[in-house]
Amino acid sequence: QMCIRDRFYLKHPEFEPDQPFDYSFSKLLSPLNIPPKNCGVGTDILIYDTDGISYPCHLFLPIVHGQNEVERILKDIDFHDDASLINDKCRKCLISNICRTCYGYNQIDRGNPQNRNLSKCKMQLAEAQVISSFQIQYYIAKKEHLTANEVLKLKAAIKCYELVHNNVFNFN
């Protein structure tokens, strides 16, 4: 299915690609020591329970963890500090700036919002390879008519492609 869609967009560059081909790799253009949080948990998102008490996300509600456990969990998490939401292994990853995770499921499944599901690393890497390769082809096909934003997207896709094709990733 994805091959059909990417061939369509390559034959018809007048159409804007949609998901997943429109993924932005622009965060890779800025060297960041600490990757930015990839969702609004605790900062841009608030969820309210039936008593009007706010929580950082629906996965941190008392109905999920129990009231006492939620209070214990939340007192140890600073959702405004991106560095506190990534572990050392992920911090060293070359594409951590574009890695997506769910901090709520990290807490539920692995006991800490920092502890990402490392079984997804290979999938995220494969996705980055395929999408960056597509974007390079797509933007080069319409190179005479690129906007400034599209030039930026092309540069970011090239950066991603170079990172994922020229490096060895340790999944252990």
What annotation goes with each model-predicted range?
Residues 13, 27, 59, 142-143, ...:
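Generic alpha-helical secondary structure signal
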Residues 20-126:
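Accessory C-terminal segments flanking Radical SAM cores
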Residues 88-172:
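Radical SAM enzyme core and accessory elements
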